[in-house]
Amino acid sequence: MNIENEAKTNHLAKSYVAETPWLDPHAVPFIQIKGLSKQFDDFSAVDCVDLDIYKGELFTILGGSGCGKSTLLRMLAGFETPSNGQIIIDGVDMSNIPAYDRPVNMMFQSYAVFPHMTVEQNISYGLKKDKLHKNDIISRVSEMLELVQLSELAKRKPHQLSGGQRQRVALARALIKQPKVLLLDEPLAALDK
């Protein structure tokens, strides 16, 4: 009976560690943020942040307006240069890697959709810049439209959509390039029911 209980306990412990990699002494963080700071003149937007985020982990940053959440995300994405510190993603120091070469996509709070493009053109924009084959682009855009439930609205322009629909366009555009890291700034701000 003791051997059986011990086996169950060991199995549960191993299962728990697999679900909580930060408890595994051998697990390597997928994202490491070390001493990250950002100064804007005399204002410290982000002050000496240290974080380890593991592969498959969902990580949320909560805080009041102006506390540095968006600035931290923008530094991870490469849109802001840290004043101090280091960002490592998948073992690679991102210090000298421009935003367009990082394995990161970001969905902005303001959506940043192109007003002169249709929904499908907005979603396909990144793939066209990567010079993917036309048939691959069509297929992936179709998958994304289905995923965000906008297939019926593919030919519409952003001004013809609700705020939540525009947000789903931005989400599809962020997901279509299959980033290793997806950063969402205020992701639930305008979603429709």
Predicted segments, located by residue:
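The feature captures the beta-strand-to-loop junction immediately N-terminal to the Walker
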Residues: 62-64
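Conserved ABC ATPase "signature" region
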Residues: 93, 128, 135-152
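Short coil-to-helix segment of the ABC ATPase nucleotide-binding domain corresponding to the Q-loop/switch region
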Residues: 117-126
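Conserved ABC ATPase signature
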Residues: 157-161, 165
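Hydrophobic anchor residue at the start of the ABC signature
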Residues: 171
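A short, proline-enriched helix->beta-strand linker immediately N-terminal to the Walker B motif
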Residues: 176-180
